[in-house]
């Protein structure tokens, strides 16, 4: 009976605590001018940890709690943006590792979710600020292509299609690295919190060893 009551209490306390922690990380990421890269890495970890410790139902409750908290604190657009991709990605990775799915599945679906979430954020923020932020991304893509062409001294002028394609490929690559880094970070940290994720594939053991 005591054990049952303890579990019930933890099922209430842990979602509240970890959802609040994740919400604070999101607020810090949104408003603080420094530490963005580190905050992005640790932002999904509280919900993932909740999933591993308490299961899918409790993790979903924690995600809903975080959504409601941020919706109240930051408004409908800024509060909802944490879902894309951080909230959804955290739930997916937590579910994958809770079900002991292999890294290839959790990573591949994870970076797809991350890429889709990036485009949703660009659209939402463009609506919020009243400017097309995709233009800024394509300009950055053109600048990268221009530097590469100039470095190799190539007689090449990229078309708008190539510029857009390079921008999309860069976003996909960024999300691939980001999700893989979360895997390595979780594999390193979670055993110290009495939670484990599946072992990495042999092919990427070298990256994991570097991360550890």
What spans do the regions from the language model cover?
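Short helix-perturbing small/polar motifs within transmembrane alpha-helices
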Residues: 83-126
